[in-house]
Amino acid sequence: MLGGYLTAAGQVLRLTAVDACERVCCLGLSLLLLRSAPEGLGGACFALLGGDLLASCGAAAVLYGFYRQGWRGVSPSEAPPGLGRRVRKLAAPLALSDYLRAALRTLEQLLIPWGLAQAGASQQRAMAAYGTVTGMVFPVLMLPAAFLYALIDLLIPELAACRAQRRAARLQSVTRQCLRAGLLFGSFTAGLLFVLAGPLAQLLYRSAEAGRLLRLFAPVALVLYLDALVDGMLKGLSEQVANVRYNTITSALDVALLFVLLPRYGLGGYVFTFIAAHLVNFALSLRRLLRVTGLRASAGAAVRTALLAVGAGAAALLTPAPGPEAAELLLRGAVYAGVYGLAACVSGTAELCVPESLRPARRAEKARALR
């Protein structure tokens, strides 16, 4: 709630700084508690939860201080008529949907080890496979999204202002550029994770299985990043109710598919369910965004960025790799980034992510017109 206030008040930098400090403090406090916690799984869980709780309390106190500071010197005034009814009309369905989604997520967490065990794996092996995905693959997969979340925090007040001022042309321009930039960032990152999955997992976890699973999930990163971006833009356009409705639908679909596929196909059923549910969620959210903003769907940018990632990935994988994982990581990462960046500039794909007023061709055309 306090974070939403700072976002609406245009104090995104403060919010970002508090969030970064909270994460650092959470890590530091958890490490301190781990040193004094009793040995075993219970002590480790206590240390992690305790560090998270203390860091969250500190962040909430700082955010409340910013909230009080923002209202200092402002005389209280009466609320507009009907404001309470409007807030209840918005908050009630959001709260109910959140409760339903929480219940569905809990059911999903219970279904996964049960379904893996039903597929023939022992309880220990089932939990180990699930832990590899959630504890090793997903953190690496979602780490680059931190840059995207910072962009989303800046987008929400900008889109809300465009909507309130009825600036349809500006709204369409911002939405179009953000979708193109998200495509470029998502395809680059997904391809990079696919290329570096093996050496990265060896360096971080010393696990070949984690590398195989990371390479399997790497292409899905494009959908995950774009889904987060589209959800953020829908929030800026006051489409929270539709957003929560789509999330609830896909959570229910997730549970149904897990119940049917997990006992029969094991981890493969989980992978299929994860990909299918997120694709459905992204398709519904993107359809809503295009309808609200009036934009027309175009597959040209998506095809171009996909070809860039495939070409750069092929060049990196065909490059002879030296023995050590660190050297392979650096060499193939450099080849991939160089080929992708060069191809994006030569093909003009990178220029499409820049506003028209800032494009070199547009500036040159205006300069010729002035002459």
Question: Would you name each region that the model predicts?
Answer:
Residues 45, 60-99, 166-169, 291-306, ...:
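Interhelical loop/hinge segments that connect adjacent transmembrane helices in multipass membrane
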Residues 230-238, 286-300:
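Alpha-helical transmembrane segments
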